[in-house]
Regions:
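Hydrophobic alpha-helical bundle segments that form small-molecule/ligand-binding pockets
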Residues: 127-155, 159-166, 170
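Basic, helix-initiating cap at the start of DNA-binding domains
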Residues: 1-29, 33-45, 59-62
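C-terminal peripheral helix-coil segments that are non-catalytic and often amphipathic
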Residues: 1-2, 135-139, 143, 175-210
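Short amphipathic alpha-helical segment with a characteristic S/N-K-E followed by hydrophobic residues
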Residues: 56-61, 71
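Short hydrophobic/aromatic patch on the recognition helix
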Residues: 44-54
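Short secondary-structure transition hinges
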Residues: 98-145
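Amphipathic, non-transmembrane alpha-helical scaffold segments
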Residues: 11, 65, 69, 119-130, ...
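Hydrophobic alpha-helical connector segments
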Residues: 63, 74-103, 156-159
């Protein structure tokens, strides 16, 4: 029985390693360019071992993105527990996104469109995030960082549209993530902020420019 438990733990650990390795390769080279052989070679395991755990590359991509999102959600939950306000959360997300995109090849985003199941999952995630964003906006109003006269539904649609614009217009291939966030996201965010919120944004952007 103990041997079976050990084997099961090993397989679960290996599954996670395969996903993490594959996602690193996908981000570095684009999804299409990465073959199962590349993943196996990087991990120093046989391709057969990978196929015993995952049916194909699309399944690895799908599960890898899910795993990545779950980790990000857990990290954000831990960050939020530190009695942070909405502006702290926004600026933390900014730093995470900048770091994330800095190590991601633009081909990765181009290739995503070729995987409908993955795109459907991402769309579902966006729908769930919209509900969380409304609660976030209400929190910002209570804390005095966001204006009381904003329409939460319209603001949510606006920020969701910005995210889709980033992918559909391939802004990631033409501009740095800092430029996109500073010129589109932060300008839109500034419009819903109170003087208190604007001061936090301006101080942050000033510190980034120094």
């Amino acid at each position: 029985m103990q041997e079976l438990k050990s084997l099961s733990a090993y397989r679960q650990g290996l599954k996670g390693k395969i996903l993490d390795t594959a996602m690193t390769l996908f981000a570095r080279n684009g999804i299409k360019a990465v073959k199962m052989d590349d993943i196996a070679r990087t991990l120093n395991i046989s391709k057969r071992t990978i196929y015993e755990l995952y049916e194909n590359k699309e399944v690895i991509l799908f599960e890898g993105i899910k795993r990545y999102n779950q980790r990000r959600e857990e990290e954000m939950s831990q960050f939020v527990k530190g009695n942070t306000n909405v502006m702290d959360i926004i600026l933390n997300v900014y730093k995470v996104k900048v770091e994330e995109f800095r190590f991601t090849n633009s081909l990765f985003y181009d290739d995503l469109e070729k995987y409908p199941d993955v795109m459907a999952y991402l769309e579902k995630s966006r729908d769930e995030n919209r509900k969380e964003l409304i609660a976030f906006l209400n929190k910002g109003v209570k804390e005095g960082y966001f204006r009381e006269d904003i329409n939460n539904d319209l603001v949510t649609i606006l920020f969701d549209s910005i995210g889709q614009l980033f992918l559909q217009k391939r802004l990631y291939a033409r501009f740095s993530i800092e430029s996109v966030l500073n010129n589109i996201m932060f300008i839109s965010l500034r419009g819903i902020c109170t003087i208190k919120g604007i001061e936090v944004l301006d101080n942050f952007l000033k510190s980034q420019a120094e």
